[in-house]
């Protein structure tokens, strides 16, 4: 839907899933074409500019959905820039360790610089919310708990109250390319499974 040559309607890209009211516009290697074609499109001054294309594609189906989630890789490509321009809320996941926080800080500084350049070409950078989600969290890990406290002291209400726990149940379910909602609870340690599901449900409810 964001292609420069022969774009298809966004509704033709979206697929139903096994989960009620949850649809999917799957990413894939085809999106690499956008990264390669955008420099040429910029050189030729094609319209609309790259940072508007994803937002325009989503606008086609905006009335059909309450929330559209765009999952971006931790890289500053044209697709990530497009997603940040299309977004109304930004959720940043962060592992509470010194190295990960330092890496996030550097990444966000680079992102801010690039977004300022994009904004100079007319992109809108107004967000309703910008939140941090502490992920892969181990409450019994003292250093992690300290870093989580540091993040909350630094960003206050911008840090989500609930955390996404680190759990072997999540990684084990991933081995079969399933979510915890799809696997059989009996195949896991029940306490481990229940803690992981509770964590996911709490984060999801807070996001809602």
For each of these PLM feature ranges, what is it?
Residues 1-208:
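P-loop NTP-binding core
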């Amino acid at each position: 839907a964001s292609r420069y040559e022969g774009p298809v309607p966004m509704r033709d890209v979206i697929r139903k899933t096994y989960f009620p009211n949850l649809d999917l516009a799957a990413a894939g290697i085809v999106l690499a074409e956008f990264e390669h074609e955008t420099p040429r499109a910029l050189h030729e001054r094609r319209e609309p500019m790259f940072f508007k294309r994803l937002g325009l594609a989503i606008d086609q189906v905006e009335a059909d959905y309450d929330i559209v989630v765009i999952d971006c890789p931790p890289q500053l490509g044209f697709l990530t820039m497009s997603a940040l321009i299309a977004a109304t809320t930004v959720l940043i996941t962060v592992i509470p360790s010194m190295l990960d926080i330092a890496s996030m800080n550097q990444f966000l500084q680079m992102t801010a610089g690039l977004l300022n350049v994009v904004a100079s070409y007319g992109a809108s950078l107004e967000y309703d919310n910008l939140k941090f989600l502490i992920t892969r969290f181990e409450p019994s890990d003292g250093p992690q708990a300290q870093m989580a406290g540091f993040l909350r002291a630094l960003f206050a209400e911008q840090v989500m109250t609930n955390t996404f726990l680190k759990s072997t149940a999540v990684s084990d379910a991933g081995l079969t390319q399933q979510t915890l909602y799809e696997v059989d609870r009996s195949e896991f340690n029940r306490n481990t499974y229940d803690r992981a599901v509770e964590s996911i449900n709490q984060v999801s409810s807070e996001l809602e």
